[in-house]
Amino acid sequence: MKLILTTAVDKLGVPGDIVEVKAGYGRNYLLPRGYAIVATRGAEKQIKDIQRAKADRVIRDQEHAEAVKAELEALSAVQVPVRTAQGGKLFGSVTSADVVAAVERAGGPKLDKHAIKLPKNSIKNTGKYAVDVKLVSGMTANLEFAVVDADK
């Protein structure tokens, strides 16, 4: 049975890998738990598109990481517009995907949302914040941004 993994499975592969497994293992374990989908031509094309888009966001090597770090730390006008109530309290909280979108709007590099390290307590008020962005092992960049009211 030919499957495409959607999550990492020990001794089998990582998300996006096309694997050949026994029919019972696929039907009774991988498919019901959502670890894989059946490999069809459409699904294979979709996986290749996702992998191509992910490759655009990946930091390739140490030199590229240093260039991205310099670019991130040079950004000064990163603003995350959100809807707020009176007193600057947010409806919800700021997520790492919101920060990535704001960086791209400000002209910064494309980042993976999993590389953003948000504070332990979530961001629920307007103001200035700083987060760490993990580029490669051992290298992080400091990113400062402002959470502002979208209506103003």
Swiss-Prot record:
Signal peptide: none annotated. Transmembrane segments: none annotated. GO terms for biological process: translation. InterPro entries: Ribosomal_bL9, Ribosomal_bL9/RNase_H1_N, Ribosomal_bL9_bac/chp, Ribosomal_bL9_C, Ribosomal_bL9_C_sf, Ribosomal_bL9_N, Ribosomal_bL9_N_sf. Keywords: Ribonucleoprotein, Ribosomal protein, RNA-binding, rRNA-binding. Belongs to the bacterial ribosomal protein bL9 family. This is Large ribosomal subunit protein bL9. It comes from Corynebacterium urealyticum (strain ATCC 43042 / DSM 7109).
